[in-house]
């Protein structure tokens, strides 16, 4: 997720940092059981990362369908046209109320299984957020050697996936790392809340470069290889994804994937993040340039590396700078952009599109797709087409 510090500023203020546990979500009723398999064979998946849902529920937030009927969030995603769910997992988020630990992930994965939806597990290999700006080493792994840390990564991967397997969950996809644009398992200086501290030039301050793609490319590849092998040990048929941001950036993909392939690391699929809003904000690109560039890159990466590609994160502007729902005109533009991404990516041979945290309130995250009172906006209609 691009620049997570900025996009989550509303969430920190709204939810606070008081201690609690996710046990209340574990006790919630699961959605009404339909059947425990995917209902139809498809070669294209429409999905969402709704990892925040149990935390939102613990705060009393409810969700409603277009008719105004209260509906469990996972079931609502299916009603909106989705057939898959993506779930992030953190190593030890005890300082952040244990959301997205393996037990919390299991709660959400069970709901998806009950509804016949496919599941993607997204390993961050950190105790909290991992993205291009930071990939902080878990506290319990700090001070370990490279070889020890490879074992840490493999053991964590197998532990989480074995829990899924023991509970009848078979993930179709597993991400080994989240937006590992600059590698994985490298740390930056942070404040007490866990947010990165930047220098006078706006750059993060790297304190440990163990798996940094520029400083230690071989070790980045080694970590990915360890994760790949760990996934296959538990789920041999799972599709292992390497996930990078800025799907329009061909040079980035060649550089990063080149590090992996030249060092013997394998992957089954390339996952891309595609955010027209962030591309305009940080790279000066129009939405058309961003989307067109990504479609071309999907075809190029697939052909060059002989693998499938999926857009595992996207999102459209849903909130203004005050955290209020944007106008109907802006929502309509978001709908058109998303509909185009879904249509053109499918035509390009892409295997699916996942929206990142669409269920979020405008006051919580500006690129969600729901209203403040938990109803899908016009943006979500793109998944029904």
Predicted regions and their residues:
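Short, acidic/polar
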Residues: 60-78, 153-163, 249-262, 335-341
